[in-house]
Every structure is written in C-alpha cells, then in structure tokens.
C-alpha cells in the first residue's frame, strides 16, 4: 500500500495533534503550499525541507507512517466510549466536571461516550488515557502476550553396561 501526500500529512497531523494551519505556522510553509501538495499529490523539495527542518528526517518515513496508521486504527476501531462512561459513573462524576477537567466541551465528551465521535489525535487519546487511568479500548482489542516455549536439547553421556552411550535430554521452558 502506498501513501498519498494527503495521507502522509493527515497521518502526521493526527499523530502530532496539529491541524494544517498549525503545521504551516510551525514550518513557515504557506497554507496554499500544503493544499497544493495534498490536492496534486506532489511533495515538493521546498515543502519537504520545511517539514524536515521542523519535525526531523523521519516525519514521512514508511516506518513512521505505518506507526501513525496503527495508532489511527486503534482509535477508529478499538476505542470504547462505553468504557469511558462506566469509569466516569463508577467515580460518580458528571459529564460537565470531567469535560472541564479535560478541557473539552461537555457535548463532545457526551458524544465520545456514546460512540458518535472519537479522538482528534493520538496525543488527545494519551491525555484521556492518563486522566482515566485506563486504556479505554475494547476488551477484544487487548492482545494477551503469547507464551513462548523454548526447547533446549542437551547431549548426555550414560554408562550402560560398562560402556558409554550418548543420549539427548529435551527441556521445554516457558519464556
């Protein structure tokens, strides 16, 4: 799967928690430059240099784009608003109190709890995760660590009837 320039910018913005204008402001890029790059699927040398100067060489590397995509997929597919609601109700908190503490509107928090909307960025998710002291993901999304079984073979020598024979001992360990 290849990434378009629009995908690269959108995934990067999602990961960093920035909108297009904030990226332009921080890099010194004109908003029309970014719009052109997204619309025409062309990343000019100047645009790339401005992004590299501010965000580093790897801002659009394949590894980072895949990581950004994984994070976005976690938010889109595995986020559980009902869990947020349960945690809030367990603490006897109101939506308005939690919204004020998180710095968002109570209607947005309510729509997140009902599953209508999700997080705008990965950084916002991390903020909520820290506030709720829970990962806020569906139970089916949590991967349990697979037990790895390592098989070790040892060569042994046995004295059988006055002469030595070679044998093997197999030992399995859970790591």
Task: Show the residue positions of the predicted features.
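DNA major-groove recognition helix of helix-turn-helix/homeodomain DNA-binding modules
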Residues: 45-63, 118-139
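Residues within the helices of the helix-turn-helix
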Residues: 10, 21, 49, 85, ...
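A short, Lys/Arg-rich alpha-helix, primarily the initiator
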Residues: 1-16, 67-90
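Short alpha-helical DNA-recognition segment
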Residues: 17-36, 92-111
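Interfacial/linker helices and their anchor residues that mediate assembly or domain coupling
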Residues: 86-93, 141, 147-175
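Short amphipathic recognition helices of helix-turn-helix/homeodomain-type DNA-binding modules
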Residues: 61-76, 138-156
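The alpha-helix within a helix-turn-helix
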Residues: 13, 24, 52, 88, ...
């Amino acid at each position: 799967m290849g990434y378009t320039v629009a995908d690269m910018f959108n995934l990067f913005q999602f990961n960093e928690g920035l909108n297009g204008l904030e990226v332009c402001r921080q890099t010194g890029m004109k908003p029309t430059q970014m719009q052109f790059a997204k619309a025409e699927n062309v990343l000019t040398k100047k645009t790339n240099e401005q992004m590299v100067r501010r965000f580093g060489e790897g801002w659009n590397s394949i590894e980072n784009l895949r990581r950004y995509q994984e994070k976005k997929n976690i938010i889109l597919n595995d986020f559980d608003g009902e869990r947020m609601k349960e945690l809030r109700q367990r603490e006897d908190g109101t939506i308005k109190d939690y919204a004020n503490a998180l710095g968002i509107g109570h209607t947005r928090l309510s729509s997140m709890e009902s599953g209508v909307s999700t997080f705008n960025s990965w950084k916002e998710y991390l903020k909520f995760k820290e506030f709720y002291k829970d990962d806020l993901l569906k139970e089916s999304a949590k991967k349990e660590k697979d037990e790895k079984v390592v098989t070790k073979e040892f060569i042994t020598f046995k004295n059988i009837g006055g002469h030595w024979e070679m044998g093997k001992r197999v030992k399995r360990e859970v790591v």
